[in-house]
Amino acid sequence: MEKTITIGEREFKFKSSAATNILYKRAFKEDILVKLTEYTKYLKELKQLGAAFKELKNSEEKTEEEINIELTALMNSDAYVKTQNFSSDTLPKLAYIMFLEANENIKTIFTKLNEDYYLEWLMTVDQDELLTVTGEVMDIWQAGTKSHSKPKN
């Protein structure tokens, strides 16, 4: 799947293909599918923690100080930290791979599968604005994964 996303005032074209996962692994020495599985697990935990915190916040028995202690514990939880790391580290890397696929020829892609080119690209994008579109990047990647994972009859 291919889509253009506006980041700040610039438009960026992103593409997900059957090669996206392999290119990601080559560039960053990590398996994006493993990262996504971990993220999903931590996201579920975070939702449970959030629901527990909401109950705590609505409780009339707890003091404001106790609520703040619980909120701090939630924000320091492994689930919160891991989901934040996925959003701020893994998704921009995935966006970079999908940017290469949409904008570079095949031979050029292979020369740019490294941290240096990733950092160079990252310097051209506003970090906060990139983080606001990571959901769209995930949607493109998942749509590309689905379109390449259909069983053949």
Predicted regions and their residues:
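Subset-of-secretome marker
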Residues: K47-A51
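Charged interaction scaffolds used for protein-protein
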Residues: M1-F14, A19-N21, K41-K44, K54, ...
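Short, surface-exposed, low-complexity cationic segments
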Residues: A18-E38
